[in-house]
Amino acid sequence: NNTARMMLSLAVARLMSEHGNTLFINFETFYGFKGILKDEENENLSDALYAFRQNHNQFHKNIVNAISHYERLDYIPDASCAEDIDDIKPEEIGTFIQAIGRELGYSNIVIDIGDGIRMPWNMMDCCDEIYICETGNYIENMRFKNFEKYLLEQGLDNIAATFKKIQVNEDENINNDDIWGRL
């Protein structure tokens, strides 16, 4: 469920930001960040991906313009164009994330992989921890089991072994303005 995943990823980012320099990036299309973090950003993930595509070696100098701040958390706002996420090659995403961490000195980078990433296991292979939502929803649980089975069949046991399942209870009143305060 996208809402549960969003709530979990933001909660993890918020907790990590209390213990170190943390950047949050989401690859979900039409995420709705503006309504959650209420920050006026100038650039976004589309701009960051464009800078990366133009110059893999020096993009970190331009990406700082796409990073916004909310309390102690740094984040890159939603892509303004869904195709920008879809167009990036799966193997480039890991390079993109690792270069940001290395060049900009983030202790933690929290990624909401979302549905926009093709072959997400390429990015997952770069992650130290992968949090998976458990909502009690039968269909969502079956989707995850099928995904886990696929990883095992493909010999990607190392990725499946890093999954940490977290119970997420969705609040019925998710549309209120204080989502950040309730994470």
Regions found by a protein language model. Give the residues of each.
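General structural signal for secondary-structure boundaries
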Residues: E41-N44, H56-H60, I88-E92, D157, ...
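Short secondary-structure transition/capping segments
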Residues: T22-F24, H69-D78, L152-I166
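Short acidic, S/G/P-rich loop/turn micro-motifs used as interaction or catalytic elements
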Residues: N2-A4, Y31, S80-K89, G116-M119, ...
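Walker A (P-loop) phosphate-binding motif
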Residues: N1-I25
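Cytosolic-facing regulatory segments adjacent to core modules
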Residues: N55-H69, Y75-D115, N141
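Conserved catalytic-core segment of NTP-binding enzymes
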Residues: T95-R182
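Charged, low-complexity, helix/coiled-coil-prone segments
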Residues: N2-L8, F33-A48, I85-T95
